[in-house]
Amino acid sequence: MQTKPYPVSIRSECFLPFGAGWVCPAPEEIRTLMQIAELTGSKAATLTGLKDSRTVRRWIGGDTPIPFSAWAILVEYAGLGKIWKV
């Protein structure tokens, strides 16, 4: 259940379940979500089970796409709902 409205600066397709048309967020959208959630790269790494923030830097730098599972964790942490639920 979504508790906050989705930010207009992030495409609505980024909040769909994986099998229902999810679109991988752009680096700027990842940065926006992290700002909303008040997450540092280190905290985002810890939440998503990463060893360090290097991979998070790759996501927000556009070098590596963020996996749906990691994005879903960050979305829920930001209070925007459980997008993984079908």
List PLM regions with ranges.
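N-terminal flexible/basic segments that precede or flank functional cores
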Residues: 1-23
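Recognition helix of helix-turn-helix/homeodomain-like DNA-binding domains
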Residues: 42, 48-65
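Secretory-pathway ectodomains
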Residues: 30-31, 48, 75-79
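Residue-level marker of regulatory loop/turn positions in helix-turn-helix DNA-binding domains and
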Residues: 22-26, 63
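Alpha-helix N-cap/N′ positions at the starts of helices
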Residues: 25-28, 51
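DNA major-groove recognition helix of helix-turn-helix/homeodomain DNA-binding modules
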Residues: 64-86
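Short basic helix-loop element that most often maps to the first helix and adjoining turn
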Residues: 27-43
